[in-house]
């Protein structure tokens, strides 16, 4: 019956997100158009433009499509978890606190998605493409991560160490919450960077959710697979809109929501270290940017480590199309899933 719950969650997530996509595309385009009109009035008239001015670019796809994912996942998880609890009522009173772990992971993802929503709104309403100020965004992300850690700590579900291949379990003591906090915030920033190319975050997260379902089965957390199953179904539907060239973009609300899922779900089952291989494409994206900045600052702007950063921009400069970059990142995501499964097997 648990398998039926997972199938129901993924199926509902797919159809609900697909339906919401049809509804959200015109609504978001109209919403963003309201804020684009004042900017268009301030733009120079065609008579004032130079004769060799660039031709007008086609309108960009609407953003904030991550709202479709959030609504679809909430409904699908609700139905799937209800079906699982009806099939196995002991899940509600289990000593492993299945319901607490599931709700905490879901809340954490929604909190990170809320931070992304604020940034999208700030980006749309203002003329700045950066959205929220960096310190404001990092503070909100840290607060979202702290809420998750406090809830898990109060219920005694917070992992105090990590499992290293060949070493075994290593107790981190008081440093564990600080490490998990840094992990969640860093993952959110990396996912935000990866959202610069159509389909990357959506496609890689889909592969990660499939891998996470398998890993949770290996580790004995099969009932909580309802959460990644629902998200996998929703992501499959959203790819209909987000595959390059995108008709609807995730936006920061979607990318941070997915980062919250990738970080909070392993953390809530006591295996936060699985996030490292599971989110491999995101770490590569953020890692390239971090290295580029460090080298540039160390050389006082005279040297760059890479021709361009992050990874998807570097691949773009090497002549790869958007579709090729999408498939490249999917291969990297599958490699991360394989590493995650191996880590779960040997731990």
Question: What would you call each of these model-derived segments?
Answer:
Residues 22-23, 29-51, 281-328:
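Membrane-proximal soluble regions of multi-pass membrane proteins
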Residues 346-347:
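Cytosolic-facing loops and C-terminal tails of multi-pass membrane proteins
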């Amino acid at each position: 019956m648990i398998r039926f719950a997972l199938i129901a969650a993924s199926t509902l997530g797919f159809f609900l997100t697909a339906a919401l996509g049809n509804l959200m595309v015109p609504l978001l385009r109209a919403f963003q158009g309201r804020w684009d009109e004042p900017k268009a009035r301030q733009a120079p008239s065609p008579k004032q433009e130079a004769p060799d001015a660039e031709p007008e670019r086609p309108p960009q796809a609407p953003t904030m499509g991550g709202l479709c994912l959030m609504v679809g996942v909430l409904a699908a998880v609700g139905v799937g978890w209800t079906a699982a609890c009806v099939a196995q009522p002991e899940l509600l009173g289990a000593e492993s606190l299945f319901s607490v772990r599931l709700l905490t992971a879901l809340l954490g993802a929604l909190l990170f998605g809320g931070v992304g929503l604020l940034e999208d709104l700030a980006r749309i309403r203002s003329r700045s493409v950066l959205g929220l100020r960096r310190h404001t965004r990092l503070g909100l992300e840290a607060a979202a991560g702290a809420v998750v850690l406090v809830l898990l700590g109060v219920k005694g579900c917070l992992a105090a160490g990590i499992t290293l291949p060949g070493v075994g379990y290593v107790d981190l003591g008081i440093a564990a919450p600080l490490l998990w906090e840094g992990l969640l915030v860093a993952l959110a920033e990396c996912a935000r960077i990866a959202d610069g190319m159509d389909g990357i975050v959506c496609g890689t997260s889909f592969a990660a959710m499939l891998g996470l379902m398998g890993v949770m089965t290996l580790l004995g957390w099969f009932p909580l697979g309802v959460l990644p199953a629902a998200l996998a179904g929703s992501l499959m539907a959203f790819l209909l809109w987000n595959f390059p060239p995108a008709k609807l973009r995730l936006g920061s609300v979607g990318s941070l929501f997915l980062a919250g899922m990738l970080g909070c779900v392993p953390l809530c089952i006591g295996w936060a270290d699985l996030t490292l291989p599971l989110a491999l494409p995101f770490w590569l994206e953020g890692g390239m940017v971090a290295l580029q900045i460090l080298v540039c600052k160390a050389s006082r702007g005279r040297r760059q480590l890479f021709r361009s950063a992050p990874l998807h921009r570097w691949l773009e400069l090497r002549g790869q199309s958007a579709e090729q970059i999408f498939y490249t990142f999917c291969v990297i995501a599958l490699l991360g899933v394989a590493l995650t499964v191996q880590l779960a097997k040997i731990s």
